[in-house]
């Protein structure tokens, strides 16, 4: 079992940071309040149990005054206990939400920095990081606090009821200790190991199925044009088959666990009566003592047999912690790629300088580029051409800092941006799409647009936007409300022109274009390159069209086996 449960160090590395963060005082305050509420609730339970036993004894003895007095206490405790239970659940849920918020912000910060999200996808070591951040963090915070409350309350119950049970029957208490130890060992070693593994696999299969459905939603037009509904149905149904198969395996184990838990719990219903009946018949105990002992026995068993009774929740929590620990461990590995032996050295500078650059495929089996050296000053545009698969896009990714399998050095321009063949349009307002990635929230946009480089925040800036949209031949978007999302899907050609509008709104010194005009006719392509030239933007382009040579001064031709040729284009 020790090989499957998360290591103690890894467990604490996930659970403890929040309680040591800047928000620790608020967190510890809520936790302290939770402990106080649980302590009070346990005390009320003890009094409730004693008064209940007193009522039963009074009924058996037909003592009316004693009965009504015990009933009054019983009812008062019952009324007081209800709000304590509700407030306790509320505080626990609130603390869980705060903890989840902090953890989510922490993981998103790691995931969306140092291009970790890209490296994770490139390496493929971690499945469904989005599901781990969304669902596993929720499971961690919710289940761990729930189990903490149960464990703490069980500890208080053990203190409160074990003494009561010992005072009534010592043999019953000894039996309870032995029974709980044996039951916990069976549950821990027989059910814990497979359930953690199966729960983790279920999380993965559910996330894969959800991702498959999201992929269909994101590619609806292409699938419809291909008439690929049957293929997509088959693939999605096959993926659901993995969900079904693993869940069937899971519920079989849960059936075994439930059978064990029910037998374990139901056996205890008759034990107190069997062990205490002789004392009752001998006149050493009242009937109320039997009632108290039975209730104390059940509550003490719940405290001692926590592993048995909460094993399903423990295994779900263990699976979530394991997946988050794997994700946490993957972040520093990806961040340290740049310092690995033979990695590419990246630094920023005023212009593009490449020295002795060699690129290989991620597995190191194929040489893409060998000993490339060149320099490109502002205004000296570069076109990269060559057959498919020789490493053109890999070279641009290396310049952008995304490709690390190789060696050499790259000095990249500080003021540069990248346009892929299919531009990314975030699901946001038209304003945010145009400013992406320089502003994400209305406050950031307003603050940024209030400076010297401001656009879009006043009537003049809106007029400037309309002018730029006309320059890239998108007049249909000129009157689109800036704070509303795009309601109609754009063609690839329109998306490419919109990406150029972004560049013209915030002109960089260099722009890296990875077949960024592939969906455009020659007239639109020529117009966009002319707009770049007028704005003093130096393009570094990948393309196959001979017409692109008209818009560039330098030509880098890549060929097989890592060979290349660098020349000037004569116009």
Model region roles, listed by residue range:
Residues 2-16, 97-141, 208-213, 217-246, ...:
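Extended non-transmembrane interhelical loops and adjacent amphipathic helices
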Residues 36, 47-49, 149-192, 245-292, ...:
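A hydrophobic transmembrane-helix motif
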Residues 483-571:
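ABC-family ATPase nucleotide-binding domain "signature/switch" substructure
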Residues 1-45, 55, 59-74, 88-92, ...:
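Membrane-integrated ABC transporters
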Residues 400:
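Helix-to-loop junction immediately C-terminal to a conserved catalytic motif
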Residues 205-209, 224-228, 234, 272, ...:
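Cytosolic ends of transmembrane helices, especially the final helix of ABC transmembrane type-1 domains
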Residues 423-485:
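Conserved "ABC signature" C-loop
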Residues 139, 197-205, 214-218, 224-271, ...:
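An intracellular "coupling" helix at the cytosolic face of ABC transporter transmembrane type-1 domains
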């Amino acid at each position: 079992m020790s090989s499957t449960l998360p290591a103690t160090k890894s467990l604490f590395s996930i659970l403890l940071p929040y309680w040591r963060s800047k928000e620790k005082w608020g967190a510890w305050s809520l936790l302290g309040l939770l402990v106080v509420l649980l302590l009070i609730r346990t005390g009320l339970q003890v009094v409730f149990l004693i008064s209940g036993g007193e009522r039963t004894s009074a009924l058996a003895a037909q003592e009316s005054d004693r009965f009504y007095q015990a009933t009054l206490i019983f009812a008062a405790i019952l009324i007081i206990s209800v709000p304590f239970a509700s407030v306790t659940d509320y505080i626990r849920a609130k603390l869980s939400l705060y903890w989840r918020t902090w953890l989510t912000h922490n993981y998103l910060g790691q995931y969306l920095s140092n291009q970790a999200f890209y490296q994770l996808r490139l390496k493929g070591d971690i499945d469904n990081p989005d599901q781990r951040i969304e669902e596993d963090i929720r499971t961690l915070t919710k289940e761990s606090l729930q189990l903490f409350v149960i464990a703490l309350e069980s500890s208080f119950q053990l203190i409160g009821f074990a003494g009561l049970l010992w005072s009534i029957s010592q043999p019953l208490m000894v039996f309870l200790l032995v029974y709980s130890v044996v039951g916990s060992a069976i549950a821990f070693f027989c059910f814990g190991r497979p359930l953690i593994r199966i729960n983790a696999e279920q999380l993965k299969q559910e996330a894969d199925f959800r991702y498959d459905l999201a992929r269909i939603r994101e590619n609806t037009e292409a699938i419809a044009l291909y008439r690929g509904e049957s293929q997509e149905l088959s693939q999605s149904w096959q993926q659901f088959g993995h969900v079904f198969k693993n869940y069937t395996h899971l519920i079989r184990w849960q059936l075994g666990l439930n059978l064990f838990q029910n037998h374990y719990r139901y056996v205890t219903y008759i034990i107190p009566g069997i062990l205490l009946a002789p004392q009752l018949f001998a006149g050493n105990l009242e009937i109320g003592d039997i009632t108290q002992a039975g209730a104390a026995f059940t509550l003490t068993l719940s405290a001692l047999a926590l592993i048995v009774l909460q094993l399903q929740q423990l295994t779900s929590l263990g699976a979530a912690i394991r997946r988050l620990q794997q994700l946490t461990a993957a972040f520093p590995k990806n961040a340290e790629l740049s310092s690995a032996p033979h990695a590419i050295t990246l630094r920023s500078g005023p212009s593009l300088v490449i020295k002795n650059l060699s690129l290989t495929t991620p597995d190191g089996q194929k040489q893409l580029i060998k000993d490339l050296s060149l320099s490109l000053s502002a205004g000296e545009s570069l076109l990269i051409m060559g057959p498919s698969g020789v490493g053109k896009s890999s070279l641009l990714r290396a310049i952008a800092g995304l490709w690390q399998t190789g060696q050499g050095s790259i000095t990249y321009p500080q003021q540069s941006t990248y346009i892929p063949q299919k531009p990314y349009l975030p699901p946001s307002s038209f304003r945010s799409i145009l400013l992406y990635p320089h502003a994400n929230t209305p406050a950031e946009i307003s603050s940024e647009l209030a400076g010297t480089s401001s656009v879009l925040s006043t009537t003049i800036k809106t007029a400037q936007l309309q002018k730029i949209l006309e320059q890239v031949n998108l007049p249909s978007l000129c009157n689109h409300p800036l704070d509303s999302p795009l309601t109609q899907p754009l063609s690839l050609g329109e998306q490419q022109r919109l990406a150029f509008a972004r560049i013209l709104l915030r002109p960089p010194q260099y722009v890296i274009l990875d077949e960024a005009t592939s969906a455009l006719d020659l007239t639109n392509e020529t117009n966009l390159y002319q707009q770049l030239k007028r704005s003093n933007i130096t393009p570094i382009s990948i393309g196959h069209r001979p017409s692109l040579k008209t818009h560039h001064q330098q030509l880098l031709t890549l060929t097989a086996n890592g060979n290349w040729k660098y020349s000037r284009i004569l116009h």
